[in-house]
Amino acid sequence: MNIQALINDKVSQALEAAGAPAGSPAAVRQSAKPQFGDYQANGVMGVAKKLGTNPREFAQKVLDVLDLDGIASKTEIAGPGFINIFLSEEFLAKQAEAALADSRLGVAADEAQTIVADYSAPNVAKEMHVGHLRSTIIGDAVVRTLEFLGHKVIRANHIGDWGTQFGMLIANLERVQQESGEVSMELADLEGFYRESKKLYDEDEEFAVKARNYVVKLQSGDEFCAEMWKKLVDVTMIQNQRNYDRLNVSLSRDDVMGESMYNDMLPKIVADLKAQGLAVEDDGAQVVFLEEFKNKDGEAMGVIVQKRDGGFLYTTTDIACAKYRYEELGADRVLYFIDSRQHQHLMQAWTIVRKAGYVPESVSLEHHAFGMMLGKDGKPFKTRAGGTVRLADLLDEAEVRAAQLIESKNPELAEDEKKAIANTVAMAAVKYADLSKHRTTDYVFDWDNMLAFEGNTAPYMQYAYTRVASVFAKAGVSMDDLQGEIKITDEKEKALIAKLMQFEEAVQSVAREGQPHIMCSYLFELAGQFSSFYEACPILVAEDEAVKQSRLKLAALTAKTIKQGLSLLGIDTLERM
């Protein structure tokens, strides 16, 4: 149950009954401190100001008609007109019982929407590097959360699979095939192959002529060029899939929707923009001038949709892409997990999309931007030699470091178990270090911090789960075979349940805002609340069997909530570490 939403509705009804205009925001939030209750309604002051009345007097009017029977044990007016709400122990215990009995932990499904999520988007014939990490794992965490809430999510891996560079790549692939027979689908060093192709293009005129010819042929649908192009795409996506699988990312080959998919739409879109009077000729190119964006001289900015040589640009593809996602995929929301430097480009494309009537305002186009991954020096994360860090190399190093960590903690474990634990911890550490940061900020990549067993880290959260799970091993009972009712006998129990009941609020926030760090913060706070409860409230040596069973139920709900929360982030738990 979303208790925040429930109370928000109740306060909204009371506001209206007390004389507030319909639709006035109740602004119910989780309280910052226990002395202010579990929730606080902050909307009274704004409404009182509009009505020209005393906020505290108006707050009292609201309280007089606020019906929280069976939910709150106490309400009070605080400060200039806040309403503090204290949940009743009976209500909390009842909600905890219901959550424990529900495989969804009490999280209600949303009214299903069709949501397209554009994330990862590596380039063909290039290896994935650390710059692809944020889009890939942030997007995947949000996608998992949306699916958990019952939405139909269409993953769109908008790979860079088109452009003039394919002429030289096809020409080089043909050369390799002629020299060594059929090309292995490994093509182990894609970066090297790309560099070699570029070198040949720059230094060998005969090769360059052939490459330029292949660009034209590919764009004209030539069978040989199309076959070679597909081979390059296949080789790249096989390699990328290894990274996705290692990272426990839910993308597959079926989710690829590359730039090339929209090629046939581009001429029609430019023709339509011209027919609507949106695109005009300027210096031989087709340009849409947007009053919403100004250049440095304060003039309407021109966005080129077709070059003077007839070629199309990324903006044209992005216009086609948004149109396709609405018209063909039936999207209600489209989420783009693309770095913050692309914001203006996207806004311009979407402005054209709206003006042309391709996507109605009822469909939400959302740029979920993210910052950069930095080294300890505060500069973009690079190798010691100053090069781009391959994603596969980063994951390899994470596994080596995690293996050393597990060896130092548990040298007595069997080798295969140590390896399995190390791999799980390694991928979790890389992902959680990123996901736990607000996505719009840059963050510093630090091996020591991400593999620490203290603080808001993956190892800490995975250990928190194993610690709770170990209680049941010691008790000799299953989490799913507990008797009796949950009864609150201590403030620490109440605080733990109150935090457990905020799980749905965290899930909804991640889905709404595209911010996985909200879930990380919630789980970290939950682990802290469990530690306080565990220290203050003996479980295995509780004063009687009823209290023991009740506390075991709270431990079970905590374990299940941590496991489910980490699962939504694409992170696995371990039964022992």
UniProtKB/Swiss-Prot annotation:
GO biological process: arginyl-tRNA aminoacylation
Matches recorded under SUPFAM superfamilies: Anticodon-binding domain of a subclass of class I aminoacyl-tRNA synthetases (SSF47323), Arginyl-tRNA synthetase (ArgRS), N-terminal 'additional' domain (SSF55190), Nucleotidylyl transferase (SSF52374)
Coiled coil: none
Superkingdom of the source species: Bacteria
Catalysed conversion reaction: tRNA(Arg) + L-arginine + ATP = L-arginyl-tRNA(Arg) + AMP + diphosphate
UniProt-listed InterPro entries: aa-tRNA-synth_I_CS, Arg-tRNA-ligase, Arg-tRNA-synth_N, Arg-tRNA-synth_N_sf, ArgRS_core, DALR_anticod-bd, Rossmann-like_a/b/a_fold, tRNAsynth_Ia_anticodon-bd
GO cellular component, one term: cytoplasm
EC class (word): ligase
Motif ('HIGH' region): 122-132
PROSITE patterns for the chain: AA_TRNA_LIGASE_I (PS00178)
Stored Pfam families: Arg_tRNA_synt_N, DALR_1, tRNA-synt_1d
Keywords carried by this UniProt record: Aminoacyl-tRNA synthetase, ATP-binding, Cytoplasm, Ligase, Nucleotide-binding, Protein biosynthesis
A molecular-function term among this protein's GO annotations: arginine-tRNA ligase activity
Annotated localization: Cytoplasm
UniProt-listed Enzyme Commission number(s): 6.1.1.19
Similarity comment: Belongs to the class-I aminoacyl-tRNA synthetase family.
Quaternary assembly: Monomer.
NCBIfam families for the chain: argS
Protein's recorded name: Arginine--tRNA ligase
Species per Swiss-Prot/TrEMBL record: Vibrio campbellii (strain ATCC BAA-1116)
Lineage, top ranks: Bacteria, Pseudomonadati, Pseudomonadota, Gammaproteobacteria, Vibrionales
Underlying gene: argS
